């Protein structure tokens, strides 16, 4: 017990000593302050760049999912639409359970089902309660992207 108390107190003293040294250098050494600012800016820029890439990747995923939905043929009769709806919802759930990382295909299935459902607002409310959050975020983005008219 005595040895562990001595080692613990030495480590605590070293940590406090380093904190005091760091604070002294930060306050009194202009070169050290510049170095800290450069590091902070570098980390901040890297974080911004990473966020831009993530946003761009998400937008590409939304576009690809909308292309999958657009290429899916939509049935015309009510019975076929009902069957199509049930198949797409089941397939979306199955895809997410089998491959949780691959949300694009699952979201495309859920969105295809949403497009043929007679009351899409109610179905979207049901999706918000039952569908996992990553897929729901993709569905929201798909709906927003599709509702905005494109200028061509």
UniProtKB/Swiss-Prot annotation:
Transmembrane segments: 5-22
Pfam families xref list: MAS20 (PF02064)
Any GO MF annotation of the entry: mitochondrion targeting sequence binding
Membrane topology, as annotated: Single-pass membrane protein
Cell compartments where the protein resides: Mitochondrion outer membrane
Major localization listed first in the record, in broad terms: mitochondrion
SUPFAM superfamilies: Mitochondrial import receptor subunit Tom20
Keywords of this entry: Membrane, Mitochondrion, Mitochondrion outer membrane, Protein transport, Transmembrane, Transmembrane helix, Transport
Residue intervals annotated with topology Mitochondrial intermembrane: 1-4
Record-level GO cellular component terms: mitochondrial outer membrane translocase complex; mitochondrion
A biological process from GO: protein import into mitochondrial matrix
Family assignment from sequence similarity: Belongs to the Tom20 family.
Function: Central component of the receptor complex responsible for the recognition and translocation of cytosolically synthesized mitochondrial preproteins. Together with tom22 functions as the transit peptide receptor at the surface of the mitochondrion outer membrane and facilitates the movement of preproteins into the translocation pore.
Subunit record text: Forms part of the preprotein translocase complex of the outer mitochondrial membrane (TOM complex) which consists of at least 8 different proteins (tom5, tom6, tom7, tom20, tom22, tom37, tom40 and tom70).
Full protein name: Mitochondrial import receptor subunit tom20
Organismal lineage: Eukaryota, Fungi, Dikarya, Ascomycota, Taphrinomycotina
């Amino acid at each position: 017990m005595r040895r562990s108390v001595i080692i613990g107190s030495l480590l605590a003293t070293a940590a406090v000593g380093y904190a005091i040294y760091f604070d002294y250098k930060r306050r009194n050494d202009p070169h050290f302050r510049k170095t800290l600012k450069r590091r902070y800016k570098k980390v901040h820029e890297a974080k911004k760049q990473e966020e831009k890439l993530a946003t761009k990747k998400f937008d590409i995923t939304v576009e690809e999912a909308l292309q999958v939905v657009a290429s899916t043929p939509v049935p015309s009769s009510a019975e076929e639409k009902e069957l199509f709806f049930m198949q797409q919802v089941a397939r979306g759930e199955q895809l997410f359970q089998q491959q949780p990382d691959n949300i694009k295909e699952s979201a495309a299935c859920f969105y295809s089902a949403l497009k043929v459902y007679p009351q899409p607002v109610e179905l979207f409310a049901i999706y918000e309660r039952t569908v996992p959050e990553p897929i729901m975020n993709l569905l929201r983005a798909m709906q927003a992207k599709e509702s905005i008219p494109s200028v061509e």
